[in-house]
């Protein structure tokens, strides 16, 4: 097989030269440089680049087989031949093939054999909850509580299917009717999650048992904690467990993860008592002290039923009625 672009071939092996640490810190991430019209697979062409992360570039693509606009999550050049990255891509695709729920993004399989290994996903319109918070600050109960109820229903379904998401956060919730839970890149089947030895997820939204793997096996309660931290952020505009600047790199777990030893600040007084009690319970340190996702749905249903349906669809997307 010919080496992929951007790589050197030494002794028949495709390699990437490692720059010194001071260069790696500021070096742009490797990119395929794909532009509109480039094919990443037969019948699948790039429309535009829409994002990316450490290991992936994300493109909007046109799929001739489905006659639809989809999303392709493409491994970056420096990870395209990395067995661990490929394994994670295939795992994510396999999990999504098992899942069919109206609040979960749909997956359409993995193309692992071509020059641009990628996962194909449903294209979702609308901003993420994080984008909404960045634009408007804390959102109203009319938006927040249906979001919480729908997301909890998805988490209940995942638990029934033996899957834990492990990265529930505002960036991974696309607003809409219903909202959609995205990004299963760190998700695991329950048996696989129980074998994890290192923290997995996004620090501010990780349950204590995710932060400190000595606390026991990971299960659906970790996702309930993540949703609780997300609802707290949406209600207040602040993290449930703020930490000092620079704590991210601390070797002391208690410094890096304040949720291991601290309680969240009380929610604003304007928060209905039933909602405040529920969110606080979802953030309990011990998994057994948290409600299940099904109990979260049951607690929110009567509150949501009494809310007025006041949404404004502006040119910039969903925003709270002020």
Residue map of PLM features:
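AlphaC helix of the eukaryotic protein kinase fold
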Residues: 76-98
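Activation segment signature within eukaryotic-like protein kinase domains
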Residues: 147-148
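Conserved catalytic-loop aspartate of Hanks-type protein kinases
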Residues: 223
């Amino acid at each position: 097989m010919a080496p992929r672009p951007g790589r050197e071939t030494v002794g028949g092996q495709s390699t990437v030269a490692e720059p010194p640490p001071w260069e790696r810190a500021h070096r742009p991430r490797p990119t395929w440089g794909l532009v509109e019209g480039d094919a990443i697979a037969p019948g699948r062409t790039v429309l535009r680049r829409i994002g990316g992360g450490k290991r992936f570039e994300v493109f909007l693509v046109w799929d001739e087989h489905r006659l639809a606009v989809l999303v392709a999550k493409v491994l970056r050049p420096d990870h395209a031949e990395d067995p661990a990255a490929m394994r994670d891509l295939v795992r994510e695709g396999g999990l999504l093939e098992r899942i069919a729920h109206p609040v979960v993004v749909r997956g359409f399989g993995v193309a692992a054999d071509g020059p641009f290994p990628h996962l194909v996903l449903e294209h979702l319109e609308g901003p993420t909850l994080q984008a909404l918070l960045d634009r408007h600050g804390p959102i109203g109960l009319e938006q927040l509580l249906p979001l919480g109820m729908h997301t909890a229903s998805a988490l209940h379904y995942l638990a029934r299917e033996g899957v834990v998401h492990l990265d529930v956060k505002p960036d991974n919730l696309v607003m809409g009717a219903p909202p959609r839970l995205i990004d299963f890149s760190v998700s695991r089947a329950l048996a696989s999650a129980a074998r994890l030895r290192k923290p997995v997820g996004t620090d501010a939204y990780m349950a204590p048992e995710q932060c400190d793997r000595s606390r026991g096996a990971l299960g659906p309660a970790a996702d309930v904690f993540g949703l609780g931290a997300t609802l707290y952020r949406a209600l207040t505009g602040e993290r449930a467990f703020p930490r000092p600047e620079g704590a991210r790199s601390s070797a002391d777990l208690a410094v890096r993860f304040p949720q291991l030893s601290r309680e969240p600040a009380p929610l604003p007084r304007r928060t209905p008592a039933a909602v405040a009690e529920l969110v606080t319970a979802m953030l309990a340190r011990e998994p057994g002290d948290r409600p299940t996702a099904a109990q979260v749905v049951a607690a929110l249903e009567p509150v949501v039923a009494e809310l007025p349906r006041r949404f404004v669809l502006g040119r910039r997307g969903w925003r709270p009625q002020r």
